[in-house]
């Protein structure tokens, strides 16, 4: 009896705090567009490997990112004025959820998620023109290096 009461109480608390998400018609149409892209334009050789649990190669990862770029979705978290999608939070959620459900490889975060936003926020026009298109086209790879204190090139 005590366990049943706890279960009931915890469900009430959860339900009160659970967010009710109702997608707009525009969001549902976008979800369908993402699903269509996954069915028709997601590189088949990459999908076959990820579906089979086979590690993808660097070339596979490039093909996946290039396909996103061709669709104009590489800048999924960027403002429109810098070549991004300008998507709403619900579209970002749908995009990430559908790619995850399809078993897509992760989008490499360094260029599009870290370096690009710093450049379009703080860079001058020359830097924006030079670097942003290559990030969106996945023509340049970016990374961030770390080292431990006292063992070589300490970043601190």
Cite the ranges covered by each PLM segment:
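Short helix-onset patch at the extreme N-terminus, typifying the N->h transition
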Residues: 7, 23-28
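Short, Lys/Arg-enriched N-terminal segments with co-localized hydrophobic residues
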Residues: 7-18
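Short, contiguous pre-domain boundary segments
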Residues: 19-22, 46-48
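N-terminal glycine-rich anion-binding loops that anchor highly charged ligand groups
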Residues: 36-40, 68-69
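Glycine-rich flavin
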Residues: 44-156
């Amino acid at each position: 009896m005590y366990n049943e009461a706890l279960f009931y109480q915890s469900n009430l608390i959860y339900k009160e705090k659970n967010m009710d998400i109702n997608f707009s018609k525009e969001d549902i149409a976008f979800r369908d567009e993402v699903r269509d892209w996954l069915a028709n334009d997601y590189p088949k050789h990459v999908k076959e490997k990820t579906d089979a649990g086979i590690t993808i190669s660097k070339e596979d990862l490039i093909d996946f990112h290039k396909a996103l770029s061709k669709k104009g979705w590489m800048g999924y978290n960027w403002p429109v004025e810098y070549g991004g999608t300008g998507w709403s939070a619900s579209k970002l959620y749908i995009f990430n959820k559908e790619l995850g459900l399809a078993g897509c490889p992760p989008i490499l975060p360094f260029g599009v998620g870290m370096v690009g936003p710093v450049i379009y926020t703080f860079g001058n026009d020359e830097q924006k023109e030079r670097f942003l298109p290559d990030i969106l086209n996945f023509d340049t790879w970016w990374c961030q290096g770390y080292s431990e204190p006292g063992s070589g090139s300490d970043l601190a």
